[in-house]
């Protein structure tokens, strides 16, 4: 951790919170001039940091601690009956790991997903520049996991492969395939891939109890939360 002590971090000015509309948020960023080293990234993920584009960040709010880092310990995960049904329902899909890049196929799917699922969010309206800045980064540890049915792209799970686990950066999927629960299936697949790679955990980002879009993460049990700088099992 001595290397981490030499890193520089910067805090943003307070701004409107993307998740809790009545709150002001402050974000702590790793110095953008710092090269994106996978081992530093892994250490920072243990401290609750996430990646967005070229930046590693975590919430740093003065008057709110609602954003709680969450991860799934893969070796302890026990799928529920509903989750087992989701896995079976999607057993006809093939998964392929691709290098992050821009394509019209990716963007068309991303655009439909944002327009139909997140039209009330700060990522609407989607644009090609936004997609590229957010997700298409030339990083050796980043993957686009493509989920296809007979060649048709149904979902993309943008995932970072770290020494300590997989970081689920973002998943977008076909909104018209609601029956498949593709967002949930992507997480279940990432848990399985973590086990296949002999890694420890899937890092899911932030659990926010009072935000419907973010509290789904407790459906995966057991789940660990970073509380007072310690990872603890949520009971």
Swiss-Prot record:
GO cellular component, alphabetical, reads: cytoplasm
Principal place of residence: cytoplasm
What is the annotated localization of this protein? Cytoplasm
> In this record, what's one Pfam family?
ATE_C
**What are the UniProt keywords, alphabetically?**
Acyltransferase, Cytoplasm, Transferase
GO molecular function ontology, one term from the record: leucyl-tRNA--protein transferase activity
Please list the reactions this protein catalyses. Answer: N-terminal L-glutamyl-[protein] + L-leucyl-tRNA(Leu) = N-terminal L-leucyl-L-glutamyl-[protein] + tRNA(Leu) + H(+); N-terminal L-aspartyl-[protein] + L-leucyl-tRNA(Leu) = N-terminal L-leucyl-L-aspartyl-[protein] + tRNA(Leu) + H(+)
Q: What does this protein do?
A: Functions in the N-end rule pathway of protein degradation where it conjugates Leu from its aminoacyl-tRNA to the N-termini of proteins containing an N-terminal aspartate or glutamate.
Q: What is this protein called?
A: Aspartate/glutamate leucyltransferase
Organism, by scientific name, is Pseudomonas fluorescens (strain ATCC BAA-477 / NRRL B-23932 / Pf-5)
Q: What is the lineage of its organism?
A: Bacteria, Pseudomonadati, Pseudomonadota, Gammaproteobacteria, Pseudomonadales
